Amino acid sequence: RMAIYYIHRMPAIQAWKTQTVPDMGYDHNTYPCKIIGATIRNEVLVAKEFPLLAEEAITMAKNAATFLIDMSRPEGAPLAFFPPTYYLDYVSSKRDWNQGKTMTLEACAAGHAFLDLYDYTGDQLYYNRAIGIADTYLKLQREDGSYPIKVDFVTGEPVNEVRAMLHPLLNYVLRLHNQYGLTKYDSIAEKGEKWMNEVAVEAFNMTGQFEDVSVLGLEPYENLTNCTAAPYASYLLNKENITEIDLQNAKDLIRLSEDQFTFWDIVPNEHGVKRFAAPCVVEQYKYWTPVDASAHNVSMAFLDLYEVTGDPLALAKAKALI
């Protein structure tokens, strides 16, 4: 509760009380889907957890949602209803290779935000935006079930042939099915999961899809990350009917996340100094740095494994990383 309250009280977040554009004093607002989508979700949580702040929090969430809607591609466009990955020229948004581009799966973050706001307010506007995003994903999916990792924000043309890791979209479709009874998008999950298992997992090429790291010229295995491996393991372990193949794939992905990115301890250097505080989880090959979100990814995967298998070691590892 204190974490969401802390975020709520940040000056750049408080700015949403009176405006419908982001306060760029917090320069990560340059990533609308990811950060402003998360802001909306945070404020809905604040409204639920702190009733005295509910009116203020929902006003902030609605203003942030207005910004995402205003920035979204229009109906009929190749990326209809998608808000952008990048805004203005802060941080990585200023890079030439990001100008006018968008990460294909980041609209899922905005979709979840719209659904959270709809759930709280009942305002059909937000539900319709979330469904519009899902409809666009239905149109964009390739015959083999895959999606390009990054595309032109106006034309929808891929920047290259690197494919996206699909756990964000699979979880989005799962929410639409389970919470709202929508089966229209089940084919996205069926085809997408098949591609993930037969291509990405089979090749063990769980590539990173970070908005601040270029995918131009990206070779297989060049930028592996727990941020795709561990969440997809969790997706498999949370299926209603888990097959033996699902379980084995999940275990392998967790092993990848532990072996390549998790430090249970650090050998001190000649001066007795440890490079990192351990245990920790580094994010990706191209950003070899401990990140809390990565620790969360791997911890949740271990916890999901424990809940399926009862393995006490998996539970111990999950607890250690938190």
Language-model features: locations:
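Glycan-recognition and catalytic cores of secretory/periplasmic carbohydrate-active enzymes
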Residues: 1-322
